[in-house]
């Protein structure tokens, strides 16, 4: 798990160095940008059947398959990716470069693409019906649909709300309205909306 999300941790650490090491600000900034650029460059927008290895760029007309996964760890709906999204947007704000915010927007649009959501929501419903709660955690984006714990939508929901405030989008707004009120309250507490 540490290796899997190490880049996000390093990015957050590097960003934390900005104010602490004013004399070495250039090095911290350079490191944060290097890590962020690696994250952006390594993200692929496709799906993979982990059993057969077959890669799909679209889920149109693909049969429901519990072995289908998003093929980039940065597109998983996971706590660490929500934190990474917020860090990338903050980095973009600090260096006045929209590249990282545009990356997060592209990721969210991919996740909330109508075809992608339809596929994984139907797969979630089918898997839950057949196997209950214990069967769903292995599915891509199961946390979006399970929506029972703060970690299911906390940081990802916060990054989604922040992004949607900057780039209003019907597909993103639709998902925000599904979030539990506690998530919206927490997000507003941590990242208050402008008056």
Where are these regions (language model features)?
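Short secondary-structure capping/junction motifs at helix and strand boundaries
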Residues: 4, 167-177, 191-194
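Aromatic-rich carbohydrate-recognition surfaces in CAZymes
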Residues: 138-167, 176
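The feature captures the catalytic groove of carbohydrate-active enzymes
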Residues: 161-165, 184-195
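Flexible, active-site-adjacent loop/turn segments at secondary-structure boundaries
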Residues: 77, 148, 194
């Amino acid at each position: 798990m540490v290796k899997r999300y190490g880049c996000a941790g390093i990015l957050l650490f590097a960003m934390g160095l900005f104010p602490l090491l004013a004399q070495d600000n250039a090095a911290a900034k350079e490191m944060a940008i290097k890590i962020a650029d690696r994250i952006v460059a390594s993200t692929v927008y496709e799906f993979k059947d982990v059993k057969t290895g077959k890669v799909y760029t679209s889920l149109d007309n693909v049969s429901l398959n519990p072995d289908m996964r998003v093929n980039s760890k940065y597109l998983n709906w996971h706590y660490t990716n929500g934190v990474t999204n917020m860090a990338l947007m903050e980095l973009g704000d600090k260096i006045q470069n929209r590249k990282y915010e545009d990356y997060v927007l592209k990721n969210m649009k991919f996740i909330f693409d109508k075809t992608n959501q339809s596929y994984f929501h139907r797969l979630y419903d089918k898997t839950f019906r057949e196997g209950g709660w214990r069967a769903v955690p292995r599915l891509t984006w199961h946390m979006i649909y399970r929506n029972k714990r703060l970690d299911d939508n906390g940081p990802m929901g916060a990054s989604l709300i922040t992004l949607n405030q900057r780039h209003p989008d019907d597909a993103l707004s639709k998902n925000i309205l599904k979030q539990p009120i506690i998530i919206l309250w927490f997000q507003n507490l941590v990242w208050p909306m402008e008056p």
